[in-house]
């Protein structure tokens, strides 16, 4: 009867553990390896907890004790210290999560655990599992890190182009307007050149008809007036060539 009543008095674990049974540590184990244990309190009462291990020198647990409010979750970080991994050696390390409902006005946690009765305690046990990554896992871990900069470079490469295109369009419009203006000036200069040439011919005819002996003077006059429009045409051509060259570049 006593054993039956003792068994009935044993409380089931009130917290929900994630993971529920195994704490998995993934190698290589040349550095500290951390795994997380989540403790969720689904009840409407505060719950005190503490985490124990069979190998306290091999692990660092933060936090290793505390109080969980109703409906809250606490994440416990379990840190495995570096060691020489032997695949033929099976891990015998275990953890235990021990809990008790927090009494009213809890202030001294040590006193709570010391004064706790065995039938008030709830516990869950977890075993430690060591996993060594294979070559495929290593390649899979490396591929995403390589893919990120490649995708980023493809996306980032063409980004400046729209800005440069808009600048070229604006510059093109300005150059086209300038070319049209210079073409108009060139047409005016050609018209003036034609007019001056006709005027020169008329003057030569008048000079020949009035004074036959003054051929040298008329020739001199023609040589002075003719280069002027030609020079203007050359200057206009230089300006047009300059702006067209800028447009092409």
Swiss-Prot record:
Parts of the chain that traverse the membrane: 228-248
Entry's localization field: Endoplasmic reticulum membrane; Cell membrane; Cell junction, Tight junction; Nucleus membrane
Modified residues (N6-acetyllysine): 125
Phosphothreonine, modified sites: 170
Phosphoserine: modified positions: 166, 214, 216, 219
Residue positions where N-acetylalanine is found in the record: 2
Biological process (GO), any one: cholesterol transport
UniProt-annotated site: Involved in binding the phosphorylated serine of the phospho-FFAT motif, residues: 50
Basic and acidic residues bias locations: 135-144
Keyword Cytoplasm belongs to the record: no
InterPro entries xrefs: Ig-like_fold, MSP_dom, PapD-like_sf, VAP
Chain residue ranges for the region called phosphorylated FFAT motif binding: 50-53
Residue ranges occupied by any MSP domain in the UniProt entry: 14-131
Topological domain spans for side Cytoplasmic: 2-227
Record carries keyword Endoplasmic reticulum: yes
GO molecular function ontology, one term from the record: cadherin binding
Physiological role: Endoplasmic reticulum (ER)-anchored protein that mediates the formation of contact sites between the ER and endosomes via interaction with FFAT motif-containing proteins such as STARD3 or WDR44. STARD3-VAPA interaction enables cholesterol transfer from the ER to endosomes. Via interaction with WDR44 participates in neosynthesized protein export. In addition, recruited to the plasma membrane through OSBPL3 binding. The OSBPL3-VAPA complex stimulates RRAS signaling which in turn attenuates integrin beta-1 (ITGB1) activation at the cell surface. With OSBPL3, may regulate ER morphology.
Family: Belongs to the VAMP-associated protein (VAP) (TC 9.B.17) family.
Domain free text: The MSP domain binds the FFAT motif of many proteins.
Protein name in UniProt: Vesicle-associated membrane protein-associated protein A
Gene: VAPA
């Amino acid at each position: 009867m006593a054993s039956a009543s003792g068994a009935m008095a044993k409380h089931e674990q009130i917290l929900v553990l994630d993971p529920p049974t195994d704490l998995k540590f993934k190698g290589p184990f040349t550095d500290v390896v951390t795994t997380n244990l989540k403790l969720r309190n689904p009840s409407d009462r505060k719950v005190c907890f503490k985490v124990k291990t069979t190998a306290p020198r091999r692990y660092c647990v933060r936090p290793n004790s505390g109080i969980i409010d109703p409906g809250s979750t606490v994440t416990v970080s379990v840190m495995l210290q570096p060691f020489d991994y032997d695949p033929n050696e099976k891990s015998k390390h275990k953890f235990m999560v021990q809990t008790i409902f927090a009494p009213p006005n809890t202030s001294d946690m040590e006193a709570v655990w010391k004064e706790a009765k065995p039938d008030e305690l709830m516990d869950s046990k977890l075993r430690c599992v060591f996993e060594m990554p294979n070559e495929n896992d290593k390649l899979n871990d490396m591929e995403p890190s390589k893919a990120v900069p490649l995708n980023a470079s493809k996306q980032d490469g063409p980004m400046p182009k729209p800005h440069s295109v808009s600048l070229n369009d604006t510059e093109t419009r300005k150059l086209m307007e300038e070319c049209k203006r210079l073409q108009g000036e060139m047409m005016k200069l050609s018209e003036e050149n034609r007019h001056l040439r006709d005027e020169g011919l008329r003057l030569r005819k008048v000079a020949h008809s009035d004074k036959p002996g003054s051929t040298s003077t008329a020739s001199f006059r023609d040589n002075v007036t003719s280069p002027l429009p030609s020079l203007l045409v050359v200057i206009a051509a230089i300006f047009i060539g300059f702006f067209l060259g800028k447009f092409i570049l």
